[in-house]
């Protein structure tokens, strides 16, 4: 069985919405997009490169897929482990609304997402990585399918926005 590993950028108060840019996700009138950018340093970049180098396949929610698919297919892959991984590995996309995917290597998850992800985990191989995709991650956590949770915490408090661990989260350790 291969491990399912989640990587989330989060604030001190648990916000995971739109870390990369002001227009990344304005759902609910969120106006703080790009909050991670001032804190992204070479050390974090090197860590992200190392994590992406260990991926065999990706598992993405619809929103994260759409954000990634708008940016990464055009990115040069030479000397960029993140772009290389995103553009050459399979991307399994969990969505109830998408019917087709344009990004090379992207595949829709069919049927029940928990059963489909369990089947993906049951395969031999390297890491199945989830990046962002907070709604999907919440589903995976409830189903006890996450083997490792990597939280990259930025020293900022936003007070609003989508949180990975909101009201009604099942207590666990």
Which role does the model predict for each range below?
Residues 1-173:
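Enzymes that bind and transform nitrogen-containing heteroaromatic metabolites
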């Amino acid at each position: 069985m291969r491990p399912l590993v989640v990587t989330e950028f989060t604030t001190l108060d648990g916000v995971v919405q739109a870390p990369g840019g002001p227009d990344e996700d304005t759902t609910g009138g969120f106006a703080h997009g790009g909050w991670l950018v001032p804190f992204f340093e070479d050390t974090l970049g090197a860590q992200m490169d190392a994590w992406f180098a260990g991926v065999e396949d990706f598992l993405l929610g619809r929103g994260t897929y759409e954000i990634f698919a708008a940016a990464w297919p055009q990115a040069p892959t030479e000397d960029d482990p993140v772009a290389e991984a995103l553009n050459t590995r399979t991307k399994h996309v969990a969505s109830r609304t998408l019917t087709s995917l344009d990004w090379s290597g992207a595949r829709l998850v069919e049927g029940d997402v928990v059963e489909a992800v369990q089947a993906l985990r049951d395969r031999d191989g390297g890491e199945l990585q989830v990046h962002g995709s907070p709604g999907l991650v919440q589903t995976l956590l409830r189903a006890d399918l996450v083997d490792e949770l990597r939280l990259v915490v930025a020293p900022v408090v936003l007070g609003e926005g989508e949180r990975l661990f909101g009201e009604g989260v099942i207590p666990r350790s």
